[in-house]
Every structure is written in structure tokens, then in C-alpha cells.
């Protein structure tokens, strides 16, 4: 569909896509009061090593955003890698209190799934950020942050919106910040 705007023909965003994104965001927000959010915040407050896997494509943007937000939130031991061999080495040599975070829109990307399984087999804490759909990544993870997203393709190209995954990441970082402030306030009150 095209519409004429002051003499220029532009493509109008179909109402159905906007409504779909709105519904996905509203549904995703209902998932954010899970106990997993609290448990992940509690774990991160102990400042363990956090390993992020950045497999390629659009997921890299989400992983880079999470990495930046964790650094801003004063997590000092954050390690991002794009190489599966390097992450395998980290899995085999890391402390058992280490956290491995995997982001996947489908929860079925083979290299991500295999690394998450390997991390669990080595007794590591695995956190997944993935779609609410039944997916293998969520099943092997210790904790999950989930989102709604409808898969869209055009001639085989993935056009699935990543908006809800960013919404989950942003909401979690905000929650984590409030959680840490609550701990600081609690510690300050105890010292009086």
C-alpha cells in the first residue's frame, strides 16, 4: 500500500503490523514479573564472570547492547565472543559460578543451542533470552527471560522484529538497577 504525502509517494506501515508489534510488547510485558528476573539480578549482584555469545546477524546487536548495559550496571567481568571455539574453551575452564547468556529469537540456532547444552553439562549457569514459543534453548537453560515475537520472512530473509527482545533486555537492566539500589539502601540502613 502506498499513500501520497505532500506530493511524495511513501509506503504506509500496515495497521496489522503495528497491531501485531503492540500485542507482542503487551504480551511480553506480562512475562516480566517472573521469578527468573529476580534470580538473575541476585546472581549478577555477586559480580560473577558473565560470558556472552554473539553468533552473527541481528543477534549481535542485542548482545552488544546487553554487554554495554551490563558494564554500565557495574558488572565488571563481562566477556563477549563471536567464536564458538573460544566459548567452548571458556565453558571448559571457567569457574562453576560463571554465567553464560545466550540470546536467540527462535531458540533453535544450532551453534547457540549446542554451546548452551555444553555449558549446562559442565555445571554452568545458563541464561537464555528467547521467544516464548517452545524452543530447545529455553529448555536447557537454568533461567529464561522470554518474549513474544511472530516470525516473518520475505523470500527466505528473516524479517522477525527484534523489538521485544530489546524490550526484555531494557526492562531487565532497569529491574537490575532498582534491585541493586534496594540492596545498597538496605546495606546503608544496616550501617546506621
Predicted segments with their positions:
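Internal, active-site/partner-interface "lid" segment
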Residues: 136, 179-192
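Short, basic, glycine/proline-bearing loop/turn elements
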Residues: 22-27, 99-102
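A short, well-structured juxtamembrane/interface segment
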Residues: 28-47
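Single conserved hydrophobic/aromatic residue that forms the stacking wall/gate
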Residues: 2-11
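Glycine-rich phosphate-binding loops that contact phosphosugars or nucleotide phosphates
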Residues: 45-167, 171-180
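Flexible, glycine/proline-enriched loop segments at strand-loop-helix junctions
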Residues: 27-28, 159
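Short, basic/glycine-rich phosphate-binding loops at helix/coil junctions
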Residues: 14-23, 65-70
